[in-house]
């Protein structure tokens, strides 16, 4: 569905991504987790076509959409994007925001689906209101519906809950996951919140220094972290010094076999 091959990218000679590779399957929700500045949002911008790729290759449905000499525009990639700040047009009504940029024939085709989605998440009564009349949670719900208006196969979610309080975050998160599952839409979520990643994801990719440190299921990363860097993302850890000898490590707690 979505494939990254050996992606490298820099801003003003500062390397952001370094030989990054990853694959997202149809219907999967994958989270990118990592510290600020590790390249998470840059990956979304490259995959969605907002930025041009410097080195490597990105495929959607097995077709190259980005490489050093190929760039398919965003509107031709069959993707949706939910921004951290919603990015709604303040001078347009909610319904106008949702259908912005779509042709009349596309609007007619998608109208019933969009209205059903709005009813499902309880925002149908907001159709004629303007963004400033909505709460932060309602604006984020509108942003999700807008991202789905063109019937995309992949949705990119850039820290969509970061500006919401914890109670509202849980509600919106549940709604979003339900809709993604119901419509079998793949999603790539950027977050710095490990709890959010564990709840939402089929797989998690932890980034460090511009590349994948570990990629796998939430339970895999939690129970079998490959490094202290990974373990620290999912809770407090105790670090013990030891010496390695004959395939085992000797610590104050005893001797343990080294993992392969």
Regions found by a protein language model. Give the residues of each.
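ABC ATPase nucleotide-binding domains
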Residues: 78-80, 84, 88, 93-229
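Conserved ABC transporter NBD signature motif
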Residues: 56-67
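Conserved structural motif at the start of ABC-family nucleotide-binding domains
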Residues: 2, 17-19
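Helix-to-loop junction immediately C-terminal to a conserved catalytic motif
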Residues: 48
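ATPase nucleotide-binding modules
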Residues: 226-260
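The feature captures the beta-strand-to-loop junction immediately N-terminal to the Walker
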Residues: 33-35
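Short beta-strand immediately N-terminal to the Walker A/P-loop
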Residues: 30-31, 81
């Amino acid at each position: 569905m979505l494939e990254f091959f050996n992606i490298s990218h820099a801003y003003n000679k500062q390397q952001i991504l370094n030989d990054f590779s990853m694959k997202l399957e149809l219907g999967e929700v994958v989270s990118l987790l990592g510290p600020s500045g590790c390249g998470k949002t840059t990956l979304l911008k490259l995959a969605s076509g907002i930025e041009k790729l410097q080195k490597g290759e990105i495929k959607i449905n097995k077709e190259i959409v980005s490489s050093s000499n190929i760039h398919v525009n965003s509107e031709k990639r069959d993707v949706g994007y939910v921004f951290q700040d919603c990015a709604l047009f303040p001078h347009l009504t909610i319904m106008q925001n949702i259908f912005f940029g779509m042709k009349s024939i596309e609007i007619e085709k998608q109208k019933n689906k969009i209205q059903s989605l709005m009813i499902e998440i309880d925002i149908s009564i907001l159709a004629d209101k303007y963004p400033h009349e909505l709460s932060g949670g309602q604006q984020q719900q509108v942003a999700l519906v807008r991202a789905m208006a063109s019937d995309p196969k992949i949705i990119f979610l850039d820290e969509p809950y970061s500006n919401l309080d914890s109670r509202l975050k849980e509600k919106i998160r549940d709604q979003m996951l339900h809709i993604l599952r119901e419509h079998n839409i793949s999603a790539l979520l950027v977050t710095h919140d490990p709890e959010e990643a564990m709840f939402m994801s089929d797989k998690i990719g932890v980034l460090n220094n511009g590349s994948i440190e570990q990629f796998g299921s939430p339970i895999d990363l939690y129970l079998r972290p490959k490094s202290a860097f990974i373990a620290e993302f999912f809770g407090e850890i105790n670090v013990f010094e030891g010496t390695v000898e004959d395939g085992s490590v000797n610590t104050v707690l005893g001797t343990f076999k080294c993992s392969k």
